[in-house]
């Protein structure tokens, strides 16, 4: 009978140890799941609050949705039309205090990359000119203008903002 008590005691100790291992395993799994959920929430919030045009020495650069990033500058290509330079400049200022893209080297590289050129008319109605494959130009301007003494088709004034 004495040997039976030792046997029962050993069984109880093994069951107690197994129960502790099970309890700790559940606790560890719960902590891992909790930290994964927490990191997922932080990542989602981070995407919502992503900086608009953020640049620093770490070479991290973000542009807002519908903007194009090129050479650490954000560009916005309008889809709506404006009447003149002043209207376009005001629309750019409404977009995160951005300024109207001007004739800077970076903009020239970008417009060259996108097959765009800039056309000046010496008045307030000038804008970006898109060169087609056959070198026929479609000036994006709201006034009538003959390019190289040829009659051209015109579209509404489009604009580019940069930040």
UniProtKB/Swiss-Prot annotation:
Any GO molecular function: carbohydrate binding
Gene induction: Expressed in the early phase of the viral replicative cycle. Expressed in the late phase of the viral replicative cycle.
Keywords: Disulfide bond, Early protein, Glycoprotein, Host endoplasmic reticulum, Host membrane, Host-virus interaction, Lectin, Membrane, Modulation of host cell apoptosis by virus, Signal-anchor, Transmembrane, Transmembrane helix
Alphabetized SUPFAM superfamilies for the sequence: C-type lectin-like (SSF56436)
Keyword Glycoprotein among UniProt keywords: yes
TM ranges: 27-47
One example of a Gene Ontology biological process annotation: symbiont-mediated perturbation of host apoptosis
Membrane side Cytoplasmic: residue ranges: 1-26
Record bears the keyword Membrane: yes
Bilayer topology: Single-pass type II membrane protein
SS bond list: 63-74, 92-161
Region feature Lectin-like, mapped onto this chain: 63-162
Glycosylated position list: 84, 96-97, 103, 109, 115, 129, 135
Stretches assigned to the Extracellular side: 48-163
GO cellular component, one term: membrane
InterPro entries registered for this protein in UniProt: C-type_lectin-like/link_sf, CTDL_fold
Compartments (UniProt record): Host endoplasmic reticulum membrane
Subunit structure: Homodimer.
Function: Down-regulates MHC-I expression by impairing the appropriate configuration or presentation into the plasma membrane of the latter. Participates in viral hemadsorption, which may help viral spread. Reduces the transactivating activity of host TP53, thus inhibiting apoptosis. Non-essential for virus growth in swine macrophage cell cultures.
Similarity remark: Belongs to the asfivirus lectin-like protein family.
Identification of the protein by name: Lectin-like protein EP153R
Organism: African swine fever virus (isolate Warthog/Namibia/Wart80/1980)
Top-level taxonomy: Viruses, Varidnaviria, Bamfordvirae, Nucleocytoviricota, Pokkesviricetes
């Amino acid at each position: 009978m004495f040997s039976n008590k030792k046997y029962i005691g050993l069984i109880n100790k093994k069951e107690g140890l197994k129960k502790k291992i099970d309890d700790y395993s559940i606790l560890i799994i719960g902590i891992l799941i909790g930290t994964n959920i927490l990191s997922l929430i932080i990542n989602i919030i981070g995407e919502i609050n992503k900086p608009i045009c953020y640049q620093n020495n770490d070479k991290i650069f973000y542009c807002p949705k519908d903007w194009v990033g090129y050479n650490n500058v954000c560009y916005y290509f309008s889809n709506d039309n404006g009447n003149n330079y002043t209207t376009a400049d005001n629309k750019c200022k409404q977009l995160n205090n951005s300024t109207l893209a001007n004739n800077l080297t970076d903009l020239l590289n970008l417009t060259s990359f996108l097959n765009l050129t800039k056309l000046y008319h010496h008045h307030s109605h000038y804008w970006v000119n898109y060169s087609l494959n056959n070198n026929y130009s479609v000036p994006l301007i709201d006034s009538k203008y003959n390019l190289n003494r040829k009659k051209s088709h015109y579209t509404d004034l489009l604009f580019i903002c940069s930040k």
